[in-house]
Amino acid sequence: DSMCLLDLLDRWCRERDGRVVAAHFNHQLRGAEADRDETFVRDWCAAHDIAFVSSSGDVRGLMEREGLSLEEAARRLRYDFLRQEAEKLGQHIKIYTAHHADDNAETILFNLIRGTGVAGLTGMAYQQNGICRPLLDVTREELAAYAAARHIPHVEDTTNADPGAAARNFLRLEVMPRLRQINPRAVE
């Protein structure tokens, strides 16, 4: 997903004499696999003349200190890093994330399960607090087709295939496929 977004943004910026900066946060939760992911993105950016910045943080430490879930601690550190990098680049810099329609459907369902009420039905905003999510209308399947057509490589986070690794994974791997059986357009 993020590699597709990086390709799209890079193409868009080059057509307008702009530039994109790829920012990668290593959560240090998956050992050598996480380091491999960072190296993969760094090398791809170098091969495509895209600026690259990265950082890492102690997600488990923040989780324990502040009583956060693993996902929330990781999100907080990641977005803090992204905001710091954006501030370094200038006042009008935007942060783009590769959240897509499937992610948004999962978010809405997750919000309902947590009891957020009507406010949770809106899902993620296309743009909020300097964060832009241009792919919210694009499905995971459409992104995979784009990646294949453009020969965009990617690496898999193996924890994404484990429904027990996080509540969101359970929704993605167990619940969403069942919802699609009821309504194939459940994500739309």
Describe the residue ranges of each PLM region:
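Core alpha/beta nucleotide-donor-binding catalytic domains of modification enzymes
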Residues: 1-177
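An accessory alpha-helical subdomain
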Residues: 179-188
